[in-house]
Amino acid sequence: MMRKILIFICFLLSSNISDAQNLIILAQQETKMYNQTWFYSGSGNSLQETKIKEYWNEDFYINSIAYTSKGWFVTMAKGLKWTNQSYSYKSSWPDEWIHEKKKAGYMITSLSSSNSNWMVVMSQNTDYNAQEICSAPWATQREWIKKWWNNDYYITSVTCRNGMWTVVMSKTSLYTDQTYMFSSTVDGIKEKIKIKWDEGYNSSLKFEIMAKQLYVASQRVL
């Protein structure tokens, strides 16, 4: 079974999820990535687009992005099979841009949002065959997720903004099963993740905080 290191960094030494200073980082061993870097913009600052382009020129690809108490937090890695990557960073949801990129063979590989901007990352040569996107309150999302799970789609990106959850589900052979969890405390979500790892769910996908609850998706992988 894949070994993992779960690193929890709480800047105000608080275990309460409602504390906006909590930053949770998941580090995983034995992946296909052989080099990784990360950087953050600083609270209230714009995305460091120049930095992204510099690392693109060194064959790094964005593999994770989140908006945190430290501003935009970007991780980029080598060793991914993707061949091209693009992103949209703007105040409105980039529907037309996503449509055009899909026609060119791109799929959404990372997604996040701040109060003022969306950040959508799309890549070519992914393991996704098709994608569905839904933006709705969580009460609606639950049924929508079940519907697409039944059609062999899996959650691959998720973000929450102003009470609305945006979920991307992808048709892929990478996963065999998937679940998600909520907790109001850091310790609570740590315990739930460990239980799922013991059950064979060996990859945690995405953390998101909304209404003082921490969300995490986890799946079994091939």
Language model feature labels by segment:
Residues 20-222:
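Terminus-proximal functional modules
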Residues 13-21:
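Bacterial Sec-dependent signal peptides at the C-terminal "C-region" and cleavage site
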Residues 4-14:
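Sec-dependent N-terminal signal peptides
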